[in-house]
C-alpha cells in the first residue's frame, strides 16, 4: 500500500506548530526548524504506520508562482527546459463567487522552509497544468486499490479507492475507509454528514462547499440533501434528482450553473476529463 499524502495540509498544520505567541508578553516565539523537521518526520511516519504502508509515501504539493520559479532555477542548473506556471483552472471557472474567495490565511513562518525540507527528503510531486495537489492524488489513485489518499480535506473522498484522515486536535482519525465510485453518506457522532464517492459529489452540488466558497443551490441544507440522495442507488438516479432541483431553483440558468458548480467540485481523476453526466436512457 502506497500512501499518497496531502502535503498542502501538512504545510499549514505543522507549519503553525513551529511558532506560538507568549501568553505573558505577546511576543511571537519561533522554534528552531530542527524541531519542526523532527515533528514532520514523526507525523509522516505515524500516518504510514496507521495505514499499514508497504511502500514509501508520495507527497503532493500544489504549485505556486514562487515554487514554479524555484523549480525552473533548478532546471536551468541541470540543463532542463523551464516549465510555464499555469494558474489553477478553477479560478477562471468560478463566476458566481470567487473560488476560495473567503480564504485570507497567512502562511506560517517556516512555510517555504518546509517545502524545501520535504523536497529534499521525500518523494514530492508538485502539481502541474493548473491542477491542485488534490487532483494529482486522485489521478494517481484512479483505477487502483494499492494506494491510499491521506488527507484531512473532505473533497478528496469523492475519489474511489482507499482514504485516511489523520487525527488533529479534537478531530478524530477516520479510516482507512474504502469507497467504490458510487460511494455513500453517513452521519458522524457529532451529527455532521460524511460522504464518499459520487454521493459526496452530488451532496456538495446541493449544499456547496463553504471552505472553497462554492455556493451550491440556494436554501438547500444538509437535511434536505441527505434525504434526497440517501436512498438512491445509481448515478443516473442521483443525477436526475439533483438536475430536477437545479431546474426548480435556477430555472433557465440551471444548465450553466450546474456546469460551473460541477467543474469546481469535481476531483479530476483523469487528466483533461471533468465530470460527465450520464447519458439519457442509460441503464
Which residues make up each language-model segment?
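Non-catalytic, usually N-terminal nucleic-acid engagement modules in DNA/RNA processing proteins
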Residues: 1-80
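Extended two-metal-dependent nuclease catalytic cores across DNA- and RNA-processing enzymes
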Residues: 23-28, 53-54, 79-88, 94-282
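Short, Lys/Arg-enriched, disordered terminal segments
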Residues: 1, 282-283
